Amino acid sequence: MKLKINTGRGVFQYKFQVIYEGVKVMNQEISRENLLIFKRLADNVGLRFSLAYGTMLGAIREHDFIPHDEDIDLCILQEDIETFKNLLWDLREEGFEVMRFDRRNSLCSLIRKGEYIDIYIFRKLCEGVREFNGEAIWEKYLTVLEEIDFQGGKFLIAKEAADFCLFEYGESWQTPIAMKPYDMAWYQKKLSQLFWWLHFNLPDCLFFPWMQRNGEGKIEAFNKKVDRYNKIAGKTVYDKIPEGIYHIAKTKK
């Protein structure tokens, strides 16, 4: 199925492909190559991005990719979405293809040589907080950055990366834990495939109410992390996000 992304360089067409957690363990050599190519092209057009989630965790804990990870996680700000969309043409020339691009301009997955990169596009939710697909994060982890050496290049990372990992993963963040069910049963794989197929193919009248409820649930999960972090700190470091503040982004690509 051919889908379209409107860019400043014309209409970018791509074929939607279903991917889901637990597909396979990443090939680190190819992933490293992909990351360095992405950085070179992003630097050429002035696109600012940083390492995120599992890739950031590996960078500060293993100083490498996490051995049991399956992809590269990067993030950009919503303000840079048009620069990123224009970059898709250059990425294609280097062998990358878009696998999925969320209709809310919040997630893009790129694949090259069988290895993929997830690009999380964070928009402002409320004061000091950003989110993509309901996944909230303190804005400082996306904007207050520092440069580190990683995989043969220099990459931006949250200046308080260790603090982010403590907030996101809890006190066990320094202990490697394989979370992906790479040996999942066939029916589990089919259910995962169905979930993501629905995510990208449901009509708007069904998709947006579903994502609104999903986002509200993720904000509740974020507030539980706030409670956990404050308990670890022994004081109130962060306040919870007010109930009812989540509103789904309906910006279309």
Annotate each PLM feature:
Residues 1-4, 253:
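Soluble, non-transmembrane catalytic domains of enzymes that act on hydrophobic metabolites at membranes
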Residues 168-173:
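Glycine-rich, aromatic-lined ligand/substrate-binding cores of catalytic
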Residues 175-177:
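His/Asp/Glu-enriched short active-site or ligand-binding loop at hydrolase and phosphoryl-transfer sites
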